[in-house]
UniProtKB/Swiss-Prot annotation:
The chain crosses the membrane at residues 7-24. It is found in: Golgi apparatus membrane. Residues 1-6 are cytoplasmic. This is Alpha-1,3-mannosyl-glycoprotein 4-beta-N-acetylglucosaminyltransferase C. It comes from Danio rerio. It is an enzyme of class 2 (transferase).
Amino acid sequence: MRCHLKKWVVVAAGLSILTSLYVYMQRAQSGNLKGSVIWTWDRESWMEGIKSHYLHFNISINVLGGVLQPSKKYLTVGLSSVRREKGFYLHDTLQSIFSESSEEELDQMVVVVLLADFDLPWIQQTADKISREFAVQLSKGRLLVIHANKEHYPPLTGLKRNFNDAPDRVSFRSKQNVDYSFLLHFSSNLSQYYIMLEDDVGCSRNFLSSIQQHIRSMTDSKWVTLEFSKLGYIGKLYQSKDLPTLARFLYNFYQEMPCDFLLSHFRRLLMQDKVIRFRPSLFQHMGTYSSFRGTYNRLKDEDFVQELADNPPADVRTNIQVFQTYVPEKAYSQDVEYFWGVSPIGTESFFLVVFREAVRISRVQIHTGSDGKDELASADVELGRVLVTGEPAVDCSGFKTLGSLQHGQFNEEGVQKLLPDAVVCLRIRVTAAQPEWVIISRIQVWTVKEDKTI
């Protein structure tokens, strides 16, 4: 009982602190800093008797490149970049954002890059490089490059060593929290939504359209954070109305814990208990060396797909017994849920996707199991060319085998070369009985894109 009471007191105190944060933002032109935006954060001390030189301050954000637009966009893509001991990935990240988006998508977004290093020559050099290589995007207001002077940062040394981290790691992650705090505040009035990236990521093709689709699917739900990657704080989406509060939250608790920990606490404090993550991931970490100490880092998101699957409209069914609400449709829906089937699973078992219109297929990818468990051990993947109408459901015939699952996985590209004709269904046919249950987490289908050139 005492433990539960203690937890409740902590949560209540956290909520009290959070709800007492008040943000006032004012934009003004600085007479000393050309092209800058002054953001004034006024607040009363949220704890009686606590005084600090950084509880009340003005920060000057210098806009180094780009044109602020008079109207709001749909999405702001925000990323912070610092000088690395090894590697430089910012150019590739920006190139990926712009090249993987259509002109229509680019008109709906703005990319904000905070050059957050204290090395001013590096800042100038990097800003000049961006100006040369992305001149068109800067001129169209699709890209903004900003910087905050060191004088606006709170103390970054002599901080609390929570988690027993080394002092330099504490300083690094604490500064990173402040970097994102400044970036969030600057971006809070630029668009309807905001997504957080790092400066060493690659993007899926047409990622904005996919984000819009998922946001529409959440119309009837209240949410704080939507996630489009499983790595750290890459791909976390927020509503811009929450950005000032989130920015203040990161700033107030900048030395307590890493940014991804704080973001999780923020989500829970605003009463979203469960993580809402969509799959496949839209963003992939591509850096080889970390911005901290230049250490080797090959972290990858295995759920990332460069070109998102089409998954044309279809009806899905199986003769495998369904466990609770883990219905067959969830394997084909491209969200975080999955199909879960109960044993026994025998050679008569199948999983069938019947397309509502005949389609030409270029690629099929299937993932089964979770953490090495509940994999479909032995099955063939087949495409059917003839629709058979009957009772109790529509079926198919004229099957051609694409291949077999290997360790519960299947990935076949260039399907149109093996089967150039349109097909009406995809079947996973079990070829050996297994006592284990089965999870089919993802079925992805890419269709042949017709060449519209003459």
